[in-house]
C-alpha cells in the first residue's frame, strides 16, 4: 500500500513524498496496521471526491477499543509530485476557523481552491466538540517538520531531549492521515472512516462490510487530552520502525512486563524503501490503551533488553513515568466545556514536546529535586531509597493490595535497645535456678520473682523479666545473681551483657583467683592436721580445669590446664592438673600465649583444695627444727554437695598425713577423724560419687575404700594385678567410676602401661584383665 505523507516545508507549503510502508513493526502494533479507507486529496488540477461521516451510519455490535488514535493520509493517483497550495474557504464553521488559525497546515488555502477541494463538515452545530464527534479517530503520528524558528525558542522547547533526530532549529509538528473506505457500495453520501483495528483486509477477500463499532462514535475531549506524545516518540534504538499493513492480524493482548519482550529486527531508517532515502524524523505510533488502562500502568517495550536483566527493569521505576501518569490522571479530570478545548491539538503537541525528556537522565534530576523539595513523588521510588530518606512510604513495585511501610528507627533508639546473648540467658537460667522456689513463678514467657528473701525496705517487689529488659534489672537482684556465679569466666560473661551490669559487679582483681569460689571453714578447737590444737581458719577453693584451644605455627592445638591468678598482678598461671610436680605453663619452653577473649575456652572439670596456715620449721640443726615460721599450706580435698532443704549442706573429705581420713560436715561445722588405715598406707586419691566418698591407697594393689557419711569405711575386693602399679587414680565417667592404674616395667623406667578397670573398657584391656585376674569395679 503506497501513500503520500504530507510534510511541512520551509515555506509552510505542503510537500508530498512517495513512500511505502514496509512490514517490519512488532506484533503488538499489528492490529493497527490493517488497511482502511482513504480519502483523496487533490490539488487545483484534479477533482476531489468527498463524503461525509454521519453518526447514524455506524455498525453496532462489534467491539472496538474505545480510544483508537487517528491519522490522516494523502493518496495520489499519479506518480508526479505536485506542490499543493492550501487555502481556506469562507463557509467553514467558526470553530473550525479558529482551528485553522492555530493549525493552518490542516486546511487547504488559496483562491483557486474550490469548495470541492475541501472536507465539508456539518455546520449546524459549530463547536469543536461536535466536529470531533463526527470524526472517527484512527491514528495519530508525530513528526519533525523543517520549520525555521528562532534558535532560542526551539532550544527552550526541545531542552533535555535525547531523541536521536536532528533537532537543530526545528519544532515538532504532526500530520493526520485519514483512511477513507475504498468500498463505495456501503458508503452513504460521504467518506466513512473506519478504525484500523476493526477493519478487514480488502485486497485479499474482496469488498467486505466495515465492522467498526458504534462505541467510538464520539471522541471524549477529556480522554483525548490525556494523550502524551512522549510515548509515541521512538528512541534511538527504535528509530525508523515501519508498519506492517498487508495482512489481517488478530487482536493481541498487551505484553506482560514480567515476560521477555519480542525482539524487533532493526531496519534501514528510511521512509521510502524503494528509493532508499533516509528520513530525518523517527515516526512511531502507540495504542492509547497502553496509556489509558484502568490501573494507569505504563507498559514499556524495549526489545533489546536481555532476559537476564528483566528483574533489573522491574526494579527501575523511572520518575518520569510516574510524573506522566500523574499528569494523565489530572488532565482526565478536566471539564468538557473548558475554554482550552479549542486548543486541543496544540496542547497535545505541547505536552508531547514537554514530555520528551531523556529517560536515562531525568531520574537523577527528579530524584534530587524530590529529595530537596520533599514532594509526594518520593513515594514512587524504590524501598531502599525510602529507607535511606527515612520516610514512611508505600512501595509502588509491590502487587495491588499489598502495602509496605518503612519506618526506620533512629540510631540512638537502636543503641538503647539491648539484645541478650546466649551467655546472658544461660547465666540468668543458672542464677534463677538457685533462688528459693517460693520466690519464682513462671507465667507464659515471663518470669515473676518475689524478692522477699532480700533485705529491702519494702516487703514485696515483683519484676517481670523479659529478654529485652536486661538493663532494667535492679541492683539488688544483680547482686543476688552474682552470688550464684562460681567461676571468674561466669563473672566475665555476666559483666559483658550490658553497661548497667558492669557497674554493679566490680572487675576481678588480684585478690580473687581465677575461677575460684571460696568458703570460710573453721577448724575444731583442739584438732589440727599436724596433731596440735589451733584456732586458725582454712579456706575451701574450687579450681576449675579448662580445655583451651590456641593457635600455633603448626596449626591449632589444645591444652588441658588449670588457671590461677598471681597475687602480685602478674599474668595468670596455667598449671597442668595431670602433673604431680605442678608444671607451670608460661615458663621456659612451656610458654603459651593466647587471647582469653578470642580463644575458645571450654570448662572441662574442677577439683577442690583447702588452704590454711601453720607453723613449720624453716631451718634444721643437728636434725632438729631450729627455726619455725608461718607457712601457707594447700591440700587437695574432695567436695560433696548434699541434698537438703536449704541446699547449703556439704561435706569435705581430706586425707591427712597421719594415714587417716578426716571429714568436715557443714551441718556440724566441725572436723571428724574417720578411721586410720589398717596397714598404715596413705591415701593416694579421693573422689565423690553418688552421695559417697571413694578413696584408693598408695599400696599400688588396687585397694579401694568406700566412706559413708556416717563415718563407716568399707573396702572393695582387690582388683590388683600381678605386679605393683606405680600410680592409681579414680575417675568418674558418666554414671560409672573407673580405676586407672599405671604400670612401669622393671628396668624400663620410661615404658609405662595404663589399665582402666570398669564396665566400658576396651576389648584388649578386658582380655588382659581376665588373663591377669583383674576384676571390674562399678
Curated annotation (Swiss-Prot):
<feature type="region of interest" description="Disordered">
    <location>
        <begin position="316"/>
        <end position="335"/>
    </location>
</feature>
<dbReference type="GO" id="GO:0010218">
    <property type="term" value="P:response to far red light"/>
</dbReference>
<dbReference type="GO" id="GO:0010114">
    <property type="term" value="P:response to red light"/>
</dbReference>
<dbReference type="GO" id="GO:0010017">
    <property type="term" value="P:red or far-red light signaling pathway"/>
</dbReference>
<comment type="function">
    <text>Together with PCHL, regulates growth and development adaptation to the ambient environment by controlling negatively phytochrome B (phyB) dark reversion, a temperature-dependent thermal relaxation process during which phyB reverts from the active to the inactive state. Contributes to red (R) light-triggered photomorphogenesis. Promotes various light responses such as seed germination, hypocotyl gravitropism and chlorophyll biosynthesis, via direct interaction with PIF1 and COP1. Prevents DNA-binding ability of PIF1 to negatively regulate the expressions of its target genes.</text>
</comment>
<comment type="subunit">
    <text>Interacts with light-activated phyB. Binds directly to PIF1 and COP1.</text>
</comment>
<feature type="region of interest" description="Disordered">
    <location>
        <begin position="74"/>
        <end position="95"/>
    </location>
</feature>
<feature type="domain" description="F-box">
    <location>
        <begin position="470"/>
        <end position="505"/>
    </location>
</feature>
<dbReference type="InterPro" id="IPR001810">
    <property type="entry name" value="F-box_dom"/>
</dbReference>
<dbReference type="InterPro" id="IPR037476">
    <property type="entry name" value="PCH1"/>
</dbReference>
<dbReference type="GO" id="GO:0007623">
    <property type="term" value="P:circadian rhythm"/>
</dbReference>
<feature type="compositionally biased region" description="Low complexity">
    <location>
        <begin position="230"/>
        <end position="247"/>
    </location>
</feature>
<dbReference type="GO" id="GO:0045893">
    <property type="term" value="P:positive regulation of DNA-templated transcription"/>
</dbReference>
<dbReference type="GO" id="GO:0090227">
    <property type="term" value="P:regulation of red or far-red light signaling pathway"/>
</dbReference>
<feature type="region of interest" description="Disordered">
    <location>
        <begin position="186"/>
        <end position="283"/>
    </location>
</feature>
<feature type="compositionally biased region" description="Basic and acidic residues">
    <location>
        <begin position="265"/>
        <end position="275"/>
    </location>
</feature>
<feature type="compositionally biased region" description="Basic and acidic residues">
    <location>
        <begin position="198"/>
        <end position="212"/>
    </location>
</feature>
<dbReference type="GO" id="GO:0009637">
    <property type="term" value="P:response to blue light"/>
</dbReference>
<dbReference type="GO" id="GO:0005634">
    <property type="term" value="C:nucleus"/>
</dbReference>
<dbReference type="GO" id="GO:0010099">
    <property type="term" value="P:regulation of photomorphogenesis"/>
</dbReference>
<keyword id="KW-0539">Nucleus</keyword>
<dbReference type="Pfam" id="PF03478">
    <property type="entry name" value="Beta-prop_KIB1-4"/>
</dbReference>
<dbReference type="Pfam" id="PF00646">
    <property type="entry name" value="F-box"/>
</dbReference>
<dbReference type="InterPro" id="IPR036047">
    <property type="entry name" value="F-box-like_dom_sf"/>
</dbReference>
<dbReference type="GO" id="GO:0009658">
    <property type="term" value="P:chloroplast organization"/>
</dbReference>
<feature type="compositionally biased region" description="Polar residues">
    <location>
        <begin position="317"/>
        <end position="326"/>
    </location>
</feature>
<keyword id="KW-0832">Ubl conjugation</keyword>
<protein>
    <recommendedName>
        <fullName>Protein PHOTOPERIODIC CONTROL OF HYPOCOTYL 1</fullName>
    </recommendedName>
</protein>
<dbReference type="InterPro" id="IPR005174">
    <property type="entry name" value="KIB1-4_b-propeller"/>
</dbReference>
Amino acid at each position: 500500500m503506497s501513500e503520500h505523507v504530507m510534510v511541512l516545508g520551509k515555506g509552510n507549503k505542503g510537500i508530498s513524498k512517495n513512500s511505502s510502508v514496509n512490514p517490519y513493526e512488532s506484533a503488538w502494533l499489528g492490529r493497527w496496521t490493517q488497511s482502511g479507507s482513504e480519502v483523496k486529496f487533490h490539488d487545483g488540477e484534479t477533482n476531489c471526491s468527498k463524503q461525509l461521516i454521519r453518526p447514524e451510519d455506524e455498525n453496532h455490535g462489534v467491539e472496538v477499543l474505545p480510544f483508537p488514535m487517528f491519522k490522516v493520509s494523502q493518496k495520489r493517483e499519479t506518480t508526479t509530485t505536485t506542490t499543493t497550495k492550501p487555502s481556506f474557504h469562507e463557509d467553514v464553521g467558526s470553530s473550525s476557523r479558529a482551528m485553522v488559525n492555530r493549525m493552518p497546515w490542516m486546511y487547504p488555502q488559496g483562491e483557486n481552491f474550490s469548495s470541492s477541494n475541501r472536507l465539508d463538515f456539518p455546520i449546524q452545530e459549530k463547536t469543536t466538540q461536535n466536529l470531533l464527534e463526527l470524526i472517527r479517530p484512527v491514528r495519530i503520528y508525530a513528526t519533525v517538520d523543517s520549520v525555521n524558528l528562532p534558535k532560542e525558542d526551539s532550544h527552550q522547547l526541545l531542552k533535555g531531549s535525547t531523541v536521536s533526530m536532528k533537532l537543530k532549529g526545528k519544532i515538532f509538528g504532526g500530520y493526520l492521515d485519514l483512511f477513507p473506505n475504498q468500498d463505495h457500495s456501503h458508503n452513504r453520501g460521504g467518506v466513512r472512516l473506519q478504525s484500523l483495528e476493526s477493519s478487514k483486509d480488502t485486497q485479499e477477500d474482496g469488498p467486505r462490510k466495515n465492522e467498526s463499532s458504534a462505541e467510538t462514535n464520539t471522541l471524549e475531549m477529556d480522554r483525548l487530552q490525556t494523550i502524551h506524545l512522549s510515548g509515541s516518540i521512538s528512541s534511538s534504538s527504535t528509530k525508523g520502525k515501519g508498519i506492517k499493513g498487508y495482512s489481517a492480524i488478530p487482536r493481541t493482548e498487551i505484553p506482560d512486563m514480567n515476560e521477555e519482550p519480542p525482539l524487533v529486527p532493526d531496519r534501514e531508517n528510511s521512509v521510502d524503501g524503494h528509493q532508499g532515502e533516509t528520513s530525518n524524523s523517527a515516526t512511531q505510533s502507540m495504542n492509547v490503551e497502553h496509556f489509558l488502562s484502568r490501573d494507569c500502568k505504563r507498559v514499556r517495550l524495549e526489545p533489546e533488553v536481555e532476559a537476564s536483566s528483566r528483574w533489573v527493569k522491574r526494579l527501575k521505576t523511572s520518575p518520569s513515568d510516574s510524573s506522566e501518569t500523574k499528569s494523565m490522571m489530572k488532565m482526565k479530570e478536566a471539564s468538557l466545556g473548558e475554554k482550552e478545548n479549542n486548543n486541543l491539538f496544540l496542547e497535545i503537541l505541547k505536552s508531547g514536546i514537554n514530555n520528551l525528556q531523556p529517560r536515562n537522565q531525568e531520574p537523577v534530576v527528579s530524584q534530587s529535586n524530590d529529595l530537596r523539595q520533599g514532594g509526594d513523588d518520593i513515594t514512587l521510588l524504590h524501598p531502599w531509597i525510602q529507607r535511606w530518606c527515612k520516610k514512611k512510604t508505600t512501595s509502588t513495585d509491590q502487587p495491588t493490595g499489598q502495602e509496605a511501610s518503612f519506618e526506620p528507627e533512629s540510631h540512638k533508639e537502636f543503641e538503647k535497645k539491648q539484645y541478650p546473648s546466649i551467655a546472658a540467658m544461660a547465666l540468668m537460667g543458672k542464677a534463677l535456678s538457685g533462688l528459693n522456689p517460693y520466690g519464682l513463678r513462671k507465667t507464659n514467657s515471663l518470669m515473676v520473682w518475689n524478692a522477699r528473701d532480700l533485705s529491702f525496705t519494702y516487703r514485696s517487689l515483683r519484676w517481670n523479666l523479659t529478654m529485652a529488659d536486661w538493663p532494667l534489672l535492679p541492683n539488688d537482684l544483680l547482686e543476688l545473681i552474682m552470688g550464684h556465679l562460681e567461676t571468674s569466666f561466669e563473672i566475665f560473661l555476666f559483666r559483658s551483657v550490658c553497661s548497667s551490669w558492669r557497674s554493679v559487679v566490680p572487675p576481678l582483681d588480684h585478690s580473687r583467683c581465677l575461677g575460684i569460689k571460696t568458703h570460710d571453714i573453721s577448724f575444731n578447737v583442739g584438732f589440727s592436721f599436724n596433731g596440735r590444737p589451733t584456732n586458725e581458719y582454712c579456706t575451701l577453693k574450687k579450681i576449675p580445669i579448662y580445655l583451651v584451644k590456641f593457635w600455633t605455627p603448626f596449626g591449632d592445638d589444645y591444652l588441658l590446664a588449670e588457671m590461677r591468678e598471681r597475687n602480685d598482678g602478674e599474668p595468670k598461671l596455667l598449671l597442668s592438673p595431670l602433673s604431680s610436680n605442678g608444671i607451670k605453663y608460661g615458663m621456659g619452653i612451656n610458654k603459651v600465649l593466647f587471647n582469653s577473649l578470642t580463644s575458645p575456652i571450654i570448662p572441662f572439670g574442677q577439683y577442690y583444695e583447702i588452704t590454711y596456715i601453720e607453723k613449720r620449721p624453716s631451718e634444721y640443726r643437728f636434725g632438729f627444727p631450729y627455726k619455725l615460721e608461718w607457712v601457707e599450706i594447700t591440700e587437695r580435698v574432695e567436695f560433696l554437695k548434699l541434698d537438703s532443704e536449704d541446699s547449703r549442706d556439704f561435706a569435705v573429705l581430706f586425707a591427712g598425713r597421719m594415714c587417716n581420713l578426716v571429714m568436715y560436715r557443714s551441718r556440724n561445722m566441725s572436723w571428724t577423724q574417720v578411721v586410720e588405715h589398717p596397714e598404715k598406707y596413705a591415701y593416694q586419691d579421693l573422689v565423690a560419687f553418688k552421695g559417697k566418698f571413694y578413696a584408693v591407697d598408695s599400696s599400688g594393689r588396687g585397694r579401694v575404700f568406700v566412706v559413708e557419711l556416717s563415718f563407716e569405711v568399707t573396702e572393695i575386693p582387690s582388683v590388683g594385678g600381678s605386679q605393683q602399679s606405680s600410680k592409681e587414680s579414680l575417675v568418674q565417667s558418666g554414671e560409672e567410676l573407673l580405676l586407672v592404674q599405671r604400670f612401669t616395667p622393671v628396668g624400663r623406667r620410661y615404658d609405662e602401661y595404663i589399665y582402666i578397670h570398669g564396665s566400658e573398657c576396651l576389648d584388649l584391656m578386658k582380655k588382659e584383665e581376665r588373663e591377669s585376674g583383674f576384676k571390674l569395679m562399678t
